[in-house]
Design a protein with these regions (language model features):
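Accessory beta-strand-rich segments of carbohydrate-active enzymes
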Residues: 16-28, 32, 40, 63-64, ...
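Carboxylate/His-rich catalytic cores and anion/metal-binding grooves
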Residues: 102, 372-384
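Short glycine/proline/serine/threonine-rich loop/turn segments at secondary-structure transition edges
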Residues: 179-182, 222-226, 298-301, 349-362
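Beta-strand-rich binding/interaction modules
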Residues: 199, 282-332
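Extracellular recognition modules
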Residues: 230-232, 364-368
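Short acidic/polar inter-strand loop motif in beta-rich domains
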Residues: 235-241, 370-377
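Intrinsically disordered, low-complexity Pro/Gly/Ser/Thr-rich segments with frequent PxxP/GP/PP motifs
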Residues: 322-350
Length: 384
């Protein structure tokens, strides 16, 4: 095992990023997609991409499909398309809404492509390719973005008829009984370009930024049995001025959708930085962990600790991982107010296998959050 060093530092709660909001809203105003000052509502702030697992054995798989706390929502969804916002279905998010006349599509998809018919007809609008221009009417001048995305273009514009397409999606899902008592999140890995989300008729939030994950804590809105998820996607929003580069502009839920679960007391974020000495013979793994508690039962939790284990596993192998280093932190106290408790940990590895193009190699870091009795509260993992 490698030499270990641990320190813990309490920090104040992270300020919300500008443009993110979390106040209670019954319904959206409907103008968020053309409000540059509003970036997201109800959406988790950016963090590292990793998952919770039930056991260390699961965690060594790293990928979400290996986890008991992951459920894919890909597959059949009900779908309704309109060419302009004023034509959209207003109350489709209500659980009792009858969507039997809607089409059934397979998510992930880009609706322009999905709607191409064998006879050449376009059921869900036109795929648009542009280099550095935006598909809606604009002018190259200072502050032109203030004119928005709904200006009337010349008649030869593809978007003259369909000024800003809107796709409405609906599906039902059930949460595993084994997730009871945990925080449940719905995750959208890519939605072009703006969307609202409702669960069981309750407004959850919205997101801009097509190419990054958008996660929402939907725990307060869930019920036992069948739940209804509704999503309304807009082709363009004020952020589309920034998402303009050499590519096809294809709206829709174009990447995976999933449910994930984490305990109320959790490893919220993780930063892992490897470092080598001048000889490349000695490595240090610097780990920064953001711990948080959203438990309503306890005001604070005493005696928590973190245990990190580093496993060696050659690339492309699924079995045979060997533990090469381990570190356990000192005990700490965590308040149940959602504020972060930052823990920094260092792990030493002698004669590490180095990554190269000729002989790629990677390690698996497994983290376990322990209570004062040594019981595992959460297990996470990542490649390094």
């Amino acid at each position: 095992m490698g030499l270990t060093l641990t320190t813990s530092v309490a920090m104040q709660a992270q300020a919300n990023l500008k443009g993110f909001s979390y106040d209670k809203q019954e319904q959206p105003t409907g103008q968020e997609w053309q409000s540059p000052e509003a970036y997201a509502h109800g959406k988790l702030q950016p963090r590292a991409h990793f998952y919770s697992f039930k056991t260390v054995s699961e965690a060594l798989g790293v990928l979400p499909e290996k986890s008991s706390y992951y459920q894919s929502l890909n597959g059949a969804w009900r779908f309704h398309w309109v060419g302009n916002p004023e034509e959209r279905e207003v109350n489709f998010f209500k659980p009792e809404y009858n969507d039997e006349k809607w089409d059934t599509v397979n998510v992930p998809m880009s609706w322009n492509i999905y709607g191409l018919q064998k006879d050449g007809k376009q059921k869900y609008g036109t795929p648009i390719y542009l280099n550095q221009r935006v598909p809606f009417f604009h002018q190259v001048k200072v502050d032109d973005w203030k004119g928005g995305v709904m200006r009337t273009p010349p008649e030869n514009y593809t978007m003259y008829k369909h000024r800003n397409e809107v796709g409405a999606y609906r599906r039902t899902f059930s949460v595993p009984s084994s997730w009871e008592g945990q925080s449940v999140y719905v995750n959208f890995d890519g939605v072009d370009s703006f969307f609202y989300i409702w669960v069981n008729g309750h407004y959850v939030g919205f997101s801009k930024n097509s190419r990054n994950r958008a996660s929402f804590d939907i725990s307060p809105y869930l019920k036992q049995g069948e739940n209804t998820l509704a999503v309304e996607v807009y082709r363009n929003n004020d952020g589309s001025f920034l998402e303009s580069q050499d590519m096809f502009r294809l709206p829709g839920i174009f990447r995976s959708v999933s449910l994930t679960a984490k305990p109320k007391v959790q490893i919220h974020d993780l930063q892992v930085t490897p470092d080598l000495d001048a000889t490349y013979q000695h490595a240090t793994l610097n780990i920064k962990t953001d711990l948080r508690s959203y438990s309503s039962k306890l005001k604070q939790l005493k005696g928590l600790s973190l245990r990190y284990s580093l496993y060696s596993l050659p690339l492309y192998l699924d079995e045979g991982a060997k533990r090469v280093a381990e570190v356990q932190s000192e005990a700490l106290t965590l308040k149940s107010d959602g504020a972060p408790q930052m823990l920094t940990t260092s792990m030493s590895v002698e004669s590490p296998n180095l990554w190269s193009a000729e002989a790629p190699y990677r390690y698996i870091l497994v983290g376990e959050l322990l209570d004062k009795k040594g019981n595992v509260l959460e297990t996470v993992s990542t490649y390094t």
